[in-house]
């Protein structure tokens, strides 16, 4: 498979481990993951991550709901390192489009990762302001699309076509976000995505790829038996 794995999280020690193992090619974070990890200082976390991982792309997200402040935060994050991609949500919480902000940042040479995308129409609008000369990431939340009982595959393929229409396929990378299971990696690769974000729990399951299913079945039976024994259950 050609697809690149990016680790999604905000635990510095886990990020360093992934970086040293060489399995993942980049990293993404967001305010929710940072809060869950107990991060108190956004700036300290960002600087520490860049210092520990200086030569792999890392995405940090702006957190204001006002576009002028988003712009200021984006420039500050961009200045922290050459490997930084600035995450911009496709809209603010009022549903107002972030496309004008993205256009302004791209014109200033900022590498953006536009996030929380769910539709090909959003990608179409975004593609019109991205640059074929500046790297960018288009994060489509395939896992959340699937949560809504919709098949994400045709949507992801349509998003890929939108980027190709604007001749952006070599600079604007399509990212399959909110991965739910290991098989999503194959799905994303088949759809033409260049990147998929994976959690540490998904990364640990990669060793199961190609595992003999009869052997896996027996291991599962043994797990149930051992847990029942350990619990001391009786009937």
Q: Model segments located where?
A:
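Active-site beta->alpha loop and helix N-cap motifs at the rims of alpha/beta catalytic domains
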Residues: 1-16, 20-24, 28-108, 137, ...
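Catalytic alpha/beta core domains of metabolic enzymes, predominantly
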Residues: 96, 103, 110-204, 210-231
């Amino acid at each position: 498979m050609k697809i690149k794995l990016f680790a999604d999280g905000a635990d510095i020690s886990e990020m360093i481990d992934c970086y040293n193992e060489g399995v993942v090619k980049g990293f993404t974070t967001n305010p929710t993951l940072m809060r869950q990890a107990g991060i108190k200082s956004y700036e300290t976390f960002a600087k520490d991550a860049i210092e520990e991982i200086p030569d792999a792309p890392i995405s940090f997200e702006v957190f204001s709901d006002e576009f002028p402040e988003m712009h200021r935060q984006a420039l500050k994050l961009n200045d922290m390192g050459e490997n930084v991609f600035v995450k911009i949500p496709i809209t603010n919480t009022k549903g107002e489009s972030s496309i004008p902000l993205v256009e302004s940042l791209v014109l200033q040479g900022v590498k953006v990762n536009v996030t929380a995308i769910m539709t090909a129409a959003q990608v179409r609008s975004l593609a019109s302001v991205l640059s074929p000369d500046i790297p960018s990431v288009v994060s489509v939340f395939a896992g959340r699309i699937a949560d809504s009982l919709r098949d994400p595959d045709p949507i992801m393929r349509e998003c890929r076509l939108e980027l190709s229409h604007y001749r952006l396929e070599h600079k604007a990378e399509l990212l399959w976000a909110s991965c739910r299971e290991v098989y999503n990696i194959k799905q994303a690769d088949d759809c033409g995505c260049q990147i998929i974000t994976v959690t540490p729990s998904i990364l640990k399951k990669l060793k199961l790829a190609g595992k003999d299913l009869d052997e896996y079945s027996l291991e599962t039976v043994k797990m149930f038996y051992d847990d029942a024994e350990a619990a001391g259950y009786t009937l």
